[in-house]
Amino acid sequence: MAINETDVKLFVDSWKQGVLDIKNVYDNKGDYQEQASKFLETHYLFETESVLFKPTLTREEIFRNSFDRALSYFIGGDIDEDKGFAIQEWKSIDTDQINILIEDELIIAMWVLSFKSDEVLKVAFTFMLKESSSDLKIKVHHSSLIK
């Protein structure tokens, strides 16, 4: 399958919606842990390969290069500093300034997401994606606050 910019944009939209879906399940007192696990399985290569993951809001344990550490970041867990990024008061997530590079097997996307609650948290993202059996998944994730 030849990956194109539309595929990458759809993946980014799916990732954003996945974060909001975790929040929705959490708000409705559902199994948000299962929802977050599905999100990671759908969007990251943790099950089959090594992944490099530098989340937005980390200070003590900067990198979360395993499934369990990533899960803790998104919903809270083993790591004291984790408050559950995906279960914050996000009402919407807007995309801006998306840049995509596709060269042979190399697929990289960089963009800005605005996480909206009572305030707006602007974050710059870079994903290095890899084609999995039938879809794209994240091999490298780096995100940082824009101040």
Predicted regions and their residues:
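Short, low-complexity N-terminal intrinsically disordered segments enriched in polar/charged residues
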Residues: M1-T48
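Residue-identity detector for threonine
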Residues: T6, T42, T48, T56-T58, ...
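Generic detection of intrinsically disordered/low-complexity segments and helix-coil linkers/edges
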Residues: K9, Q33, K38-L40, E47, ...
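Generic ordered-secondary-structure signal
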Residues: S14, E81-K83, Q97, V120-V123, ...
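Generic structural hydrophobic/aromatic packing signal, biased to beta-strands
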Residues: W15, T95, I100, F127-L129
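Residue-level marker of positions within ordered structural domains that often coincide
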Residues: L20, S114, S134
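Surface-exposed, charged secondary-structure patches
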Residues: L52-K116
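Short beta-strand edge/turn micro-motifs at domain boundaries
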Residues: I102-M110, D118-K147
